[in-house]
From Swiss-Prot:
Pfam families: Clp_N, NBD_SMAX1. It comes from the Eukaryota. The lineage of its organism: Eukaryota, Viridiplantae, Streptophyta, Embryophyta, Tracheophyta. It comes from Arabidopsis thaliana (Mouse-ear cress). Residues 8-199 form the Clp R domain. This is Protein SMAX1-LIKE 5. The gene is SMXL5. PROSITE patterns: CLP_R. May function in a transcriptional corepressor complex.
Length: 1028
């Protein structure tokens, strides 16, 4: 039986165990569930004197082959090989990117310590096997008596150099090193050389060099032999057990004094971490206390979810204790948590969203009315972003639906922040503030920028970058002090981790080092900025001081923006770093070149033209985070990428505006993307009509792409599906439900003050893009049709291009067999058949055949008697006259109107896009609701007794699409009331009750007043008929 007690103590030396300890800390800080060889390799590279780092430098082609790592020569070599720190920095960045790609576990779900990955267990076993084989050979060479040799199994402690070699054998580590320009085989050879040379220059292979009086080689060899541990029983030997909890406690309880790997820098590293944490906290407070800008809501952006959550928790604690409140303005500030899981937020109903917003508003207002400040903490912003899926065209698109709870939540939170911070001129309101704060990874924040409109605009967010580690927190760039173009050569010898913020800001803000093209664009934007500022105030209130602080800050921001944009865009081909052919394309700067940063556009899978639409995102620890990109796709606001303008002298110049697309978008690809998004939205909204939805989407997008009006006619009995089509099109094509104009010609203006023709004329003059849903177009009058015909025939708007507004017209027609007057209702009856004791129960199909037409006959008789006495003016008369022929008894005016009506209605026949949407006959939820309501009155019995109940399929079809709220109330107030009457009047609780459809009749003949139940076509009562 394995004891497992010596799992770590008997397999790893102190140095190797210390490396795994720090790897565990790194994995836990990043929120990873397992410790992989990538964590170990990143930890080994974190020390400047580590064995792996020295081996990487030695394996580089530019390294001198005659050089040995003597302690006295190490510093001298560092100054004469400037490219080696850059190469190691690049390698650290590659490992950091690889770690960012590993899956993370959310904070609430992350319990306990990370476990050992299978790849790391295999690496430890390889290291143990190599170490044991080497020690056996050494022992055999030192033994003088062969007969004393033992064949027992030896368990040895794994040295650090063997651990490094085994880690380099891992495929994932080798792949990352190859991407950074290193050869793992060459590095392994250098590790072996370094371990041998350390015998002559020091007693350690980890960079901690000993004095000249260090033991000789024979003494060290003797010490290595004494490290061997013999077991009496070979079964007692134990390999690495990843599930054994002792290794975790061993790492966590190990003191810093037992860490020779980072012994020289452990105290300073801890102090540096504390100092950086204080700087990060101060950056967040500075964002909260901003006064000259609207972006006062910080979002903590980091590479680890657990780390950012811990950072916010520390910020909450310090704010409550008042430890970081310097000016007193953040006193009595309380956090209000308001966040959801990504899955829960996607499937919320409108009622749930409104309830949550109401509770949030109540909490915030209770704090502000009592003179306190509030910070709405939204947690990880991943729940605010829609899911992005790949479509068939190779691009990406967001999932659209008829109602988006995410958009609703985001908009309501933005409105709440604006209302609370803009509370009028009340003096008490000026001291009350409401902020919103969240956390996000770099990928999540980029997706928040890709929203339309972006979350940064809606919530006035300002990102603050908080890397999880000082050494490995490279974010997306190598932090360097070489930001200006012509820095002195003294700066080249500075540490790459050192950073002079004031010097960089001074250089970037005051020196405009751009190409002529970008300088022209800067001048143009600066002029427009000054012009906009002059328009805000009258002349007697404008500041005549050219060096005013606000204007100076704006100009400095423009210079900084254009410097970085020009440096990123135009100088990538001319400025090559000493990296050589670095696969990632990340230049890291030198004494004469400026460092650059890369964005996360590649990781999101965007196309080149989509990448160019966004300028580079720069996350820096020292100056919080500056996001300088615009991921908006509004082509009407941004126009083309290259714009022609005229300067003051009248010369025509070509300028490149920041934030606009650098390449002309492919119209075909863009149309395909929009078409796929619209098809997906329509199929999700009306899943039973997938083929028709695709045809509708294709016809609409064909006209939209040509910047023409879209005209379609939808016939059929599925009124609900027609309305869903209009709502989905308005949201997917024009981006909002507010662009939908609904005109129901059956109402004839009774419910609304304005007539349909007046409403249509007003909306046609609206400059905004509109989707018209016109129901029952066959009931339109001549004036209404004249307006539509004039719009349909108007071609000047397309030719001249004066009016770029587009409109989509969705015209619907009801089936002639299903045309319902607004005063018509369904007639529903209950057929009750008592079960005779001596007869068998008949099948329900026989009952429907024999007794299913009683109500229809009654309806027909009522209709015939009603029609014989009255003339229903609501019934559309059939056109029996010959088309174009005028009645001889009509006046000339009547003839002209009829001729005009005929000519205006002819345009309907010219609309080619026609579709039919009929309701399916599948029983829906209405039948289940009816059965459930029936069983509340007549419960089922186990022994075959009780009342049998069925619903006619025709009735289920007619009830399809009724509003659930009205239908539920009808079931309780009308249907169940009728059932109680049947139950009280029945002699026995047996028999068959069938709910049948009795046709559609006029409500006047039905005797029910104006309209059916709650203005629906449901009857106010259910007729009951008994059959013996």
């Amino acid at each position: 039986m394995r004891t497992g007690g010596y799992t770590i103590q008997q397999t790893l030396t102190t140095e190797a165990a210390s490396v795994l300890k720090h790897s565990l800390t790194l994995a836990r800080r990043r929120g990873h569930a397992q410790v992989t060889p990538l964590h170990v390799a990143a930890t080994l590279l974190s020390s400047r004197t580590s064995l792996l780092r020295r081996a990487c430098i030695k394996s580089h082609p530019g390294f001198s082959t005659n050089y040995q790592f003597a302690p006295s020569r190490l510093q001298h070599h560092h100054h004469h090989n400037q490219n080696h720190p850059l190469q190691c920095r690049a390698l650290e960045l590659c490992f950091n990117v690889a770690l960012n790609r590993l899956p993370t576990v959310p904070g609430p779900m992350f319990h306990g310590q990370p476990s050992l990955a299978n790849a790391l267990v295999a690496a430890l076993k390889r290291a143990q096997a190599h170490q044991r084989r080497g020690c056996i050979e050494q022992q055999q060479q030192t033994q003088t008596h062969p007969q004393t040799q033992q064949t027992q199994l030896l368990a040895v402690k794994v040295e650090l150099e063997q651990l490094v070699i085994s880690i380099l054998d891992d495929p994932s580590v080798s792949r990352v090193m190859r991407e950074a320009g290193f050869n793992s085989t060459a590095v392994k050879s250098c590790v072996e050389d370094c371990s041998v040379s350390s015998v002559f220059y020091g007693g350690s292979a980890v960079g901690v060099f000993s004095s000249p009086n260090s033991p000789d080689q024979q003494q060290q060899h003797h010490n290595s032999i004494n490290r061997l541990h013999h077991y009496q029983n070979p079964k007692d030997f134990n390999f690495i057990n990843p599930n054994f909890p002792l290794w975790q406690t061993h790492f966590l309880n190990q003191s810093p004094d037992q860490n020779p790997l980072l012994l020289s820098s452990s105290a300073s590293h801890h102090h540096q971490q504390q100092r950086l944490r204080e700087i990060d906290l101060k950056l967040v407070v500075d964002v909260l206390m901003r006064k000259k800008t609207k972006k006062k809501n910080p979002v903590i952006v980091g590479d680890s979810i657990s780390f950012t959550e811990g950072f916010v928790s520390e910020l909450m604690a310090k704010l409550e204790r008042g430890e970081i409140d310097q000016t007193g303005e953040l006193k009595q500030t309380h956090f209000v948590k308001f966040h959801f899981s990504p899955m829960a937020s996607k499937f919320m109903r409108r009622e749930d969203v409104e309830l949550n917003i109401k509770e949030l508003r109540k909490k915030v207002l209770s704090l502000t009315t009592s003179g306190k400040n509030a910070i709405i903490f939204t947690g990880d912003l991943k729940w605010t972003v829609k899911e992005i899926t790949n479509n068939n065209s190779g691009g990406i698109n967001e999932i659209s639906s008829s109602y988006s709870p995410l958009d609703h939540l985001v908009e309501e939170i933005g409105k709440l922040i604006t209302e609370c911070n803009d509370d009028g001129d009340d003096d008490d309101c000026k001291t009350r503030k409401v902020w919103v704060m969240g956390t996000a990874s770099f990928q999540t924040y980029m997706r928040c920028q890709m929203r339309q409109p972006s979350l940064e605009t809606l919530w006035a967010l300002h990102p603050v970058s908080v890397p999880s580690s000082a050494n490995l927190g490279l974010s997306l760039h190598a932090t360097s002090g070489h930001e200006a173009r012509n820095m002195s050569t003294v700066n080249a010898t500075k540490s790459l981790s050192g950073y002079d913020k004031a010097e960089e800001e001074e250089t970037i803000s005051h020196v405009l080092s751009c190409c002529p093209e970008c300088v022209t664009s800067f001048d143009r934007e600066a002029k427009s900025l000054k012009a906009n500022q002059d328009k805000l105030l009258p002349s007697w209130l404008q500041s005549h001081d050219a060096d005013s602080s606000s204007q100076k800050d704006e100009l400095m921001g423009l210079k900084r923006k254009w410097n970085r944009f020009c440096e990123t865009l135009h100088n990538q081909t001319g400025q090559l770093s000493m990296m050589g052919n670095y696969p990632y394309g990340l230049p890291y700067g030198s004494s004469h070149e400026s460092s650059k940063s890369t964005s996360l556009i590649d990781s999101l899978g965007l196309k080149p033209n989509q990448r160019a639409t966004n300028s580079i995102a720069k996350f820096r620890r020292q100056n919080s985070c500056t996001i300088e990109f615009d991921l908006g796709g509004n082509e009407h606001e941004k126009g083309e990428s290259i714009n022609e303008a005229e300067d003051d002298k009248g010369n025509e110049t070509v300028t490149l505006d920041l934030g606009r697309s650098l390449f002309r978008s492919d119209s075909v690809t863009d149309t395909r993307l929009k078409l796929s998004a619209l098809v997906k939205a329509l199929e999700e909204s009306i899943p039973r009509q997938t083929v028709t939805m695709r045809l509708i989407a294709e016809s609409l997008m064909d006209c939209v792409s040509k910047k023409k009006d879209s005209w379609i006619i939808i016939e059929g009995r599925d009124t609900t599906a027609k309305r869903r089509v209009a709502r989905t099109v308005s949201e997917s094509v024009f981006g909002s439900f507010e662009s939908l104009v609904h005109i129901d010609l059956k109402k004839k203006g009774n419910e609304s003050k304005a007539s349909p023709a007046t409403l249509l004329a007003y909306e046609l003059k609206n400059p905004e893009k509109v989707v018209f849903l016109i129901e029952d177009i066959d009931l339109a009058d001549s004036r209404f049709l004249k307006l539509l015909a004039d719009r349909f025939e108007d071609k000047r708007r397309i030719k001249t291009g004066i009016d770029h507004r587009q409109a989509i017209f969705i015209l619907t027609k009801e089936d002639s067999r299903n045309v319902r007057n607004r005063d018509s209702v369904l007639q529903i009856g209950l057929e009750i058949t008592a079960q005779s004791p001596g007869k068998k129960r008949k099948p329900e199909s026989d009952l429907s055949i024999e007794n299913g037409f009683w109500m229809k006959k009654e309806v027909c008789s009522r209709q015939s008697s009603f029609n014989s006495s009255y003339l229903d003016l609501n019934i559309k008369a059939e056109d029996e006259e010959v088309e174009g022929e005028i009645s001889p008894i009509s006046s000339d005016l009547t003839g002209e109107e009829e001729t005009e009506f005929s000519s205006s209605s002819n345009f309907l026949n010219r609309i080619q896009n026609r579709f039919v949407l009929n309701r399916s006959c599948e029983p829906g939820i209405e039948k289940g609701m009816i059965t459930a309501a029936f069983r509340e009155i007549f419960p089922e019995r186990e022994e075959g007794g009780g009342v049998r109940f069925s619903v006619e399929d025709k009735l289920v079809e007619e009830l399809y699409g009724i509003q659930n709220g009205a239908f539920e109330r009808w079931l309780k107030e009308v249907f169940q009331t009728g059932l109680l009457t049947v139950k009280k009047g029945g002699k026995k609780d047996t028999g068959v009750i069938r709910m049948v459809f009795g046709g559609i009749v006029d409500n006047k003949g039905y005797g029910g007043g104006v309209g059916g139940y709650m203005a629906t076509f449901l009857p106010n009562k259910v007729q009951v008929s008994k059959f013996e």
